[in-house]
Amino acid sequence: MMRHVAGADQDTDDERVTAAVAAAQHGDETAFRTVYRTVHPRLLAYVRTLVGDADAEDVASEAWLQITRDLGRFTGDADRFRGWTATIARNRALDHIRKVGRRPLPGGDETVLHGIPDRSDTADEALASLATGRAMALISRLPADQAEAVVLRAVVGLDAKSAAQVLGKRPGAVRTSAHRGLRRLAELLEDDTASDGVTFAGAPTQKDVR
């Protein structure tokens, strides 16, 4: 399970987002701000993976304009909303890439999640470690398909099926890309943090990204 808020806390967060989306669809501005504050940081991290630091804010703003415009037509819970917004953001990012004629390398986002545990004793902690700002800065070293799969699953919080819908791929292909990307990120993080005395109990396995 690739979520950084586990168990009851995750359920509560999902319920809050689901309720806020429903209220925002009826014109509740406070609810919309709740949705934005909850979803935007990780959505922006995904956009950075696609277009790089320089244009990420502009592309994310375009995505939110469409999200706001089409919100009334959305149906579903928090999970579906995350997938829906990620699809919109990806489409806006690909439009931007077509305009500029190239896919820039992403930069790091130090605001998504902070802090690397001194030691990852469980798979969940290992996965959480891979979504720190330091890991985000290393994603530029991954192939594009692996980078997207990792960010959609480990940062945005989508399951394999939802991520596959965003990417237009089979869930199995997304699991494979995420698995390979996480393994490589774990290696890069191990190298990058060795001088700081940070260690990892081990890279995640294929089972961890299902």
Regions flagged by a language model, labelled:
Residues 2-6, 23, 165-166, 170, ...:
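C-terminal edge and immediately downstream basic/flexible tail or linker adjoining helix-turn-helix-like DNA-binding
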Residues 4-8, 25-33, 44-62:
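Short, charged helix-capping/linker segments at alpha-helix termini
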Residues 15, 21-45, 135:
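A short, charge-rich alpha-helical start-of-domain segment used by transcription regulators
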Residues 25-26, 50-53, 62-79, 99-101:
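Sigma70-family region 2
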Residues 26-29, 101, 117-152, 156-166, ...:
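Amphipathic alpha-helical segment used for protein-protein interaction
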Residues 69-76, 86-108, 128:
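Arg/Lys-rich amphipathic alpha helix in sigma70-family domain 2
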Residues 82, 96-119, 126, 196-198:
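Short, basic/polar amphipathic helix motif occurring as a linker/hinge flanking DNA-binding modules
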Residues 90, 94, 98, 146, ...:
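DNA-recognition helix of helix-turn-helix
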